């Protein structure tokens, strides 16, 4: 039963059995991205997502993630998508541009297609921050993707 003034609440669990999950991962800052991927896929497996129902596409950098997500979302082959990448501040304005455009693009794809997308693109000041956050963020994206896929199915 709901926790909110006796109003019925949509309830989901984190059992990913039968869900088809697509992952788009940037190859830029590869060590961090592969750490995100490792944590993400380990959590997907823990949540009963079959390896046969997971697919990964790699792209050169963070700015290419939204287009790959959009194509996957429109394919009808996935129940949820996950974006993985790392944008680490340098000495130029490029960090803000890449961070803002990537985040905006990921959100736009989700809203335009109705596809749940977990955003696991880290934006950090330095490599140490990215390395410190990659495990938890990767696992969190897996949980978010499963929860939102199941919630959206209930809402329809």
UniProtKB/Swiss-Prot annotation:
Catalyzes the formation of 6,7-dimethyl-8-ribityllumazine by condensation of 5-amino-6-(D-ribitylamino)uracil with 3,4-dihydroxy-2-butanone 4-phosphate. This is the penultimate step in the biosynthesis of riboflavin. One of its GO terms (biological process) is riboflavin biosynthetic process. The active site is at 94 (proton donor). Signal peptide: none annotated. It comes from Aromatoleum aromaticum (strain DSM 19018 / LMG 30748 / EbN1) (Azoarcus sp. (strain EbN1)). NCBIfam families: lumazine-synth (TIGR00114). Its EC number is 2.5.1.78. Belongs to the DMRL synthase family. The keyword Chloroplast does not apply. Pfam families: DMRL_synthase. SUPFAM superfamilies: Lumazine synthase. Pathway: Cofactor biosynthesis; riboflavin biosynthesis; riboflavin from 2-hydroxy-3-oxobutyl phosphate and 5-amino-6-(D-ribitylamino)uracil: step 1/2. One of its GO terms (molecular function) is 6,7-dimethyl-8-ribityllumazine synthase activity. 5-amino-6-(D-ribitylamino)uracil binds at residues 28, 62-64, 86-88, 119. CDD domains: Lumazine_synthase-I (cd09209). This is 6,7-dimethyl-8-ribityllumazine synthase.
